[in-house]
């Protein structure tokens, strides 16, 4: 697994598990909003009033609606934030 994937997965998983609202900016400038429902290597399922499958290669930036604590290597991510 690549180093980039080791950063993406915990970040997206935290957003998914904590139901954090996100703004996703695409490379063409379009802004999508919702919550991360699920994700895999290539896509993110974004849920709002409808579900959208967003291809990762089309994403420029993901902005959480509130600060999130992303677990580092060796952490389970289940403990409370300090």
UniProtKB/Swiss-Prot annotation:
Any one GO cellular component localisation term in the record: cytosol
UniProt key word Cytoplasm: no
Domain Sm: 9-68
UniProt keyword annotations, A-Z: RNA-binding, Stress response
GO aspect biological process, one term: regulation of translation, ncRNA-mediated
GO MF annotations, alphabetized: RNA binding
UniProt cross-references to PROSITE patterns, sorted A to Z: SM (PS52002)
Family indicated by similarity: Belongs to the Hfq family.
Subunit: Homohexamer.
Its job: RNA chaperone that binds small regulatory RNA (sRNAs) and mRNAs to facilitate mRNA translational regulation in response to envelope stress, environmental stress and changes in metabolite concentrations. Also binds with high specificity to tRNAs.
Protein name: RNA-binding protein Hfq
């Amino acid at each position: 697994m690549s180093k980039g994937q080791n950063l993406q997965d915990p970040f997206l998983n935290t957003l998914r598990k904590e139901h954090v609202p996100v703004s996703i900016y695409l490379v063409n400038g379009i802004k999508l909003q919702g919550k991360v429902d699920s994700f895999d290597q290539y896509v993110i399922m974004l849920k709002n009033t409808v579900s959208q499958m967003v291809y990762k290669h089309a994403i420029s930036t993901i902005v959480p609606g509130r600060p999130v604590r992303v677990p580092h290597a060796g952490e389970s991510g289940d403990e409370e934030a300090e």
